[in-house]
């Protein structure tokens, strides 16, 4: 009974539901199944709820180990990958609901029911791709759990014993989650623009709009997170910026998406170039988050594998 009520159990069930939701979304796309699409959405919501429950229970468990050990569960790769899965899924669910509602309105006011029926499901078309990146994160969580025992709660290293962590890390991962969502929507855009699954994916205009709005939200939160990180660094190390590898790559990520938004808003770019850019941007962001921890050393080395 103790295991069933543990944070590890909730997070493992979250992982299972995300995997099932991914399969259901793809079934909805390939078979055009409304039932599969609705089931996928419900499983995604359930997975998010279990992930949140797991993190809250883990927070409580850390305090049961000792008041000096207790901390908000955003301090290591295991915890932040769970957070990443939740945030990315929530962002997808928001856009799914928003565009499904808009589609329902257009269907209601449209004269032709036959045309509306043939229209691809927005939620399934986007979810099938977004859930792939969540599945990759789930795979990492499972590997990290069983191979490295990462689910074990550890005391915070001195550098993380700060209230700044409670706001810097979540803001960062809203950025990461929305950047990941934009990249996967970019993949869907590229496939549809080349005639692959063209009749089963949402309109290019919808995909382009989701991609743009996701990067806009992500850029705003990533900017806030970077500023908070600089303030935290000033308190912890005596300087706002030290050109640590993590800081340098965070700046590269920020400049990348600043340029993306600039060419869209000022230069009027649309379509495939920005879709490719969003996909490549995720690779840059992934290296900034994981690659730096694996291959480079610096003040942020406490986040290594």
Regions found by a protein language model. Give the residues of each.
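Polytopic transmembrane helical bundles with strong interfacial aromatic enrichment
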Residues: 1-305
């Amino acid at each position: 009974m103790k295991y069933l009520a543990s944070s590890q159990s909730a997070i493992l069930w979250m992982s299972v539901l995300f995997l099932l939701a991914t399969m259901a979304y793809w079934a909805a796309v390939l078979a055009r199944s409304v039932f599969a699409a609705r089931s996928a959405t419900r499983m995604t919501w359930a997975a998010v709820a279990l992930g949140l429950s797991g993190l809250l229970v883990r927070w409580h468990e850390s305090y049961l180990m000792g008041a000096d050990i207790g901390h908000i569960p955003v301090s290591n790769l295991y915890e932040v990958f769970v957070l990443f899965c939740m945030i990315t899924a929530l962002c997808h669910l928001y856009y799914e609901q928003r565009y499904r509602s808009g589609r329902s309105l257009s269907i209601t006011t449209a004269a032709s029911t036959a045309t509306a029926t043939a229209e691809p499901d927005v939620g399934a078309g986007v979810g099938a791709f977004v859930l792939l990146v969540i599945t990759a994160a789930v795979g990492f969580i499972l590997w990290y759990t069983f191979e490295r025992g990462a689910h074990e709660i550890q005391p915070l290293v001195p550098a993380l014993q700060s209230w700044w962590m409670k706001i810097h890390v979540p803001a960062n991962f809203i950025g990461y989650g929305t950047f990941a969502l934009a990249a996967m929507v970019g993949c869907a855009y590229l496939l549809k623009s080349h005639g692959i699954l063209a009749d089963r994916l949402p309109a290019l205009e919808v995909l382009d709009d989701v991609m743009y709005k996701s990067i806009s939200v992500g850029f705003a939160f990533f900017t806030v997170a970077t500023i908070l990180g600089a303030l935290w660094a000033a308190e912890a190390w005596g300087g706002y910026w030290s050109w640590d590898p993590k800081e340098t790559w965070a700046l590269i990520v920020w400049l990348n998406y600043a340029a993306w938004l600039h060419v869209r808003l000022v230069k009027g770019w649309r379509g495939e170039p920005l879709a490719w850019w969003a996909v490549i941007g995720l690779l840059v962001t992934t290296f900034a988050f994981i690659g730096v921890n694996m291959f480079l050393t610096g003040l942020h080395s406490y986040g290594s594998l």
